[in-house]
Amino acid sequence: MSLFDKLFGGLRMSWPAVVLFGVGAGLYAGVMGSIKPLEPTSLHDICVTMEWWVIFAFVIATNCEKGCECALKTFVFFLVSQPLVYAVEVLAGTLVLDRAIYYYTAIWGPATLLTLPGGLVAHLIGRQDPLGAVVLGLGDTLMVVTGCSYVVRLVQEPPFHLLTVILCFGGVVVMTLAIQKEKKNRIVSFATIVVAFVALMAILAATGRVLV
């Protein structure tokens, strides 16, 4: 079993492990967000966009046996981690309390609640069939969209965000190959990414919006 096979399906995701995972992720992100010189770099991106959090959710989803278990554990992970991110930044003096409360109640609070139904759906990514492949592809599309937005920033200010670009696109390939074992299902996942991304770009074009 490779490292990635172990990570996506070979771990014992107990409740204590979920809580410790959430604490570790929250503290790390909070520290990265508190170091001002890191703001234009990939190390700070975990505090701004979702790429790492998608990966964390996939790790939990692929190591749960049932959908309800996945939903609850994903919810608890974000319930623990996100307030910690803001708490660390407030204590470090890089974020004022009222802004932290606003960001959490406006963004991550509602997003955390959505992980309950989201976790039920995300649990399907481990299924070795077309449905699992499609759900995985839709999740991977979030990584692709984030990666494309950072490509634009990378072109504008090289080499900032290079590691995040590599993480996004490399993560899609690694997770697809590690989670879906059959070639035909991997093809379905990659095809889903293409279709979903093209559809998103068409919607943005039709509404006069841009990706970045």
Q: Which sequence ranges carry the predicted segments?
A:
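N-terminal topogenic module of multi-pass integral membrane proteins
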Residues: 1-83
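Central hydrophobic cores of alpha-helical transmembrane segments
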Residues: 72-83, 135-143, 185-199
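Membrane-interface helix caps and helix-loop-helix hairpins in membrane proteins
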Residues: 38-40, 150-159, 208-210
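Juxtamembrane boundary at the C-terminal end of a transmembrane helix
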Residues: 199-212
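Membrane-water interface at the C-terminal end of transmembrane alpha helices
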Residues: 116-130, 173-188
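Membrane-proximal helix-loop-helix units in multi-pass membrane proteins
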Residues: 87-157
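Structural signature of hydrophobic alpha-helical transmembrane segments
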Residues: 41-52, 100-111, 157-168
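Hydrophobic cores of alpha-helical transmembrane segments in multi-pass inner/ER membrane proteins
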Residues: 52-62, 110-123, 167-175
